[in-house]
């Protein structure tokens, strides 16, 4: 088994606390609403949303994958940090054991925020992760962020 790391940063015009509330804490409800072409639904299979919770994310018909299961590893409200692991389905296939993800949202002096994202791909056997594949996953996540950001800009009273 190998572990491949991919780190990235993305900026947002939305303040850190508001973005954390919308994108992380209520993302299970908001993302299927603002990006139904990407995610059909999110349901808690076990747990209450905190560490140990298992979620099933269902993708729309025509997507390359039907679903993915994720386990919540950490929710740090004070530091706007969220960690979770993809543990079943989706892109894991025969080559990945799991993908561990950490998102930390940091306030910027201009009132916006920076999302610092760390992904750890745990491969099966001697499989290697290609940079293009990791970049494609990052771009999909960024598209979800932009959909949430657009919603928040259009609904200034939401998630304050």
From Swiss-Prot:
Example GO biological process: abscisic acid-activated signaling pathway
Keyword match Cytoplasm: yes
Domain of life: Eukaryota
Location of this chain's protein in the cell: Cytoplasm
Binding residues annotated for brassinolide, in chain numbering: 55, 82, 84, 101
Principal location class: cytoplasm
Keyword Nucleotide-binding: no
Cellular component GO terms, alphabetical: cytoplasm; nucleus
GO molecular function, one term: protein phosphatase inhibitor activity
Annotated keywords: Allergen, Cytoplasm, Pathogenesis-related protein, Plant defense
Gene3D superfamilies referenced in this protein's UniProt entry, alphabetically: 3.30.530.20
Family, similarity comment: Belongs to the BetVI family.
Function in brief: May be a general steroid carrier protein.
Name of the protein described by the UniProt record: Major pollen allergen Bet v 1-M/N
Record organism: Betula pendula
